[in-house]
């Protein structure tokens, strides 16, 4: 199991516009992503602070193996993944 969490910022008010509109707002940015694959240590990904901003190799491999993702607010994380991580950073699409 992959546990996944995002920290974000935006001029859009999440409580007023909802997760999908928030994730589509051009001012919405990802501050960092934290993830844990199984019992491995928690990893952090910070846009602009990596050799490149593509998906970390261990996370990509875990997804490719069919490992499931859990998140405390999965609709938010999924919206952000689909509308920010994939188009802006080239992360693979998730269902």
Where do the model's predicted regions map?
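Short consensus segments that form the blades of beta-propeller domains
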Residues: 21-26
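Conserved DEDDh/DEDDy metal-dependent 3′-5′ exonuclease domain
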Residues: 2-4, 8, 13-17, 28-95
């Amino acid at each position: 199991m992959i546990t996944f969490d995002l920290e974000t910022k935006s001029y859009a008010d999440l409580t007023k516009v909802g997760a999908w509109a928030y994730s589509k707002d051009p001012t919405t940015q990802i501050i960092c992503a934290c993830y844990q694959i199984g019992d491995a240590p928690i990893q952090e990904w910070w846009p602009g602070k990596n050799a490149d901003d593509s998906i970390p190799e261990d996370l990509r491999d875990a997804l490719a193996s069919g490992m499931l993702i859990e998140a405390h607010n999965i609709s938010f994380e999924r919206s952000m993944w689909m509308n920010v991580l994939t188009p802006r950073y080239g992360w693979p699409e998730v269902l």
